């Protein structure tokens, strides 16, 4: 039996980040957390590209375009969708979630889902590091680990 475990090492990796401008007071915090975590784990600052989009619904297509360039080893999707009084929240959350999963599987590229889907502004702020923890930073670490475990699987397959 073979066990594959990924290490958190960003040396030599090129990372794309798509981030929604809507609810920027939250998404900027997520972005900062992701960038700082990537650099802390060995990704060169110049190897991190950020694409700002109007809202979360625009993230999947932008991520797909980023991946199509073949410049990125993996991508992080960041946004904050906060429930309002209408069904709009449900449609946006469903669309962005399905879109990101579809792009990841279709392109065989890891995309970390850092789109917060919360009932309140306070919940979004908590998850963006205003109190503790930052889902952007968590996504960065998860992406590096996922990329490493995928490399290990491919390496074993080639052996």
Curated annotation (Swiss-Prot):
Q: EC number(s) in its UniProt entry?
A: 2.5.1.78
Binding of 5-amino-6-(D-ribitylamino)uracil: at which residues?
A: 22, 56-58, 80-82, 113
> Per the record's keyword annotation, is Nucleus included, yes or no?
no
Query: Mind telling me which InterPro entries this protein's record contains?
Result: LS (IPR034964), LS/RS (IPR002180), LS/RS_sf (IPR036467)
Superkingdom to which the source organism belongs: Bacteria
Residues at which (2S)-2-hydroxy-3-oxobutyl phosphate binds? 85-86, 127
GO biological process assignments = riboflavin biosynthetic process
Active-site residues (renumbered): 88
One GO cellular component this record assigns the protein to is:
cytosol
Keyword set for this entry?
Answer: Riboflavin biosynthesis, Transferase
Its pathway? Cofactor biosynthesis; riboflavin biosynthesis; riboflavin from 2-hydroxy-3-oxobutyl phosphate and 5-amino-6-(D-ribitylamino)uracil: step 1/2
Q: Which reaction does it catalyse?
A: (2S)-2-hydroxy-3-oxobutyl phosphate + 5-amino-6-(D-ribitylamino)uracil = 6,7-dimethyl-8-(1-D-ribityl)lumazine + phosphate + 2 H2O + H(+)
Q: Name one Pfam family in it.
A: DMRL_synthase
One Gene Ontology MF term:
6,7-dimethyl-8-ribityllumazine synthase activity
NCBIfam families in UniProt: lumazine-synth
Briefly state the protein's biological role: Catalyzes the formation of 6,7-dimethyl-8-ribityllumazine by condensation of 5-amino-6-(D-ribitylamino)uracil with 3,4-dihydroxy-2-butanone 4-phosphate. This is the penultimate step in the biosynthesis of riboflavin.
Hey, which family's this protein in? Belongs to the DMRL synthase family.
This protein's name: 6,7-dimethyl-8-ribityllumazine synthase
Q: Which organism is it from?
A: Lactiplantibacillus plantarum (strain ATCC BAA-793 / NCIMB 8826 / WCFS1) (Lactobacillus plantarum)
